[in-house]
Amino acid sequence: MRGKFITIEGVEGSGKTTQIQYIARYLTEKNIPHIITREPGGTALGKKIRELLLNPSYPVVPEAEILLYLADRAQHVGEKIIPHLDKGVWVISDRYFDSTLAYQGYGRGFDLTLLKSFIAFATKGLIPDLTVLIDLPPEVGLSRVKGRGEYDRLERETLEFHQRVREGFLQLARDQRFRVVDGRKKPEEIFWEIKGFLEGLNG
């Protein structure tokens, strides 16, 4: 049986990493084989691309930014995601193509139709079984990020940019594969909701 593909999305500081840790623990308890991965940086090549994308000392023009994310995703899908799904392993990814649509499409204003065609090429048309959006006002998320130390290149964008990204995610979340949770809740409460989504997939 093919594995399930689950993606976790949200603005900066939304608590994706914490929820992914909860998900991994849950799947382990249920004896469901799984891997945890991320974009960008889910492969050896992707880690190099991630360094280029998020390092503030490397100025990246918007068009190059899109193509770097797509290169990372193409490698990620071909090298890691599809092979694991084919073996019956569940794949949990911290971000996937919805982040490109939210950040580069809604955030930077690139044509969504064009982006979707690029994404379809890079992903071989692979769509998640479930996408969880942890929704959070960007000012709350950025204040959380500030507590971690230095901002990366995307985190340094304006509040207005991050507000557009959030609105983009909410527009994308109209798709039936999405489930939206309130990122202002306690982490345990958020996971209680996510656990219900996982049980629905595994039923």
Curated annotation (Swiss-Prot):
GO terms for molecular function: ATP binding; dTMP kinase activity. One of its GO terms (cellular component) is cytosol. Keywords: ATP-binding, Kinase, Nucleotide biosynthesis, Nucleotide-binding, Transferase. It catalyses: dTMP + ATP = dTDP + ADP. Pfam families: Thymidylate_kin. ATP binds at G10, V11, E12, G13, S14, G15, K16, T17. One of its GO terms (biological process) is dUDP biosynthetic process. Its EC number is 2.7.4.9. NCBIfam families: DTMP_kinase. Belongs to the thymidylate kinase family. Phosphorylation of dTMP to form dTDP in both de novo and salvage pathways of dTTP synthesis. This is Thymidylate kinase. The gene is tmk.
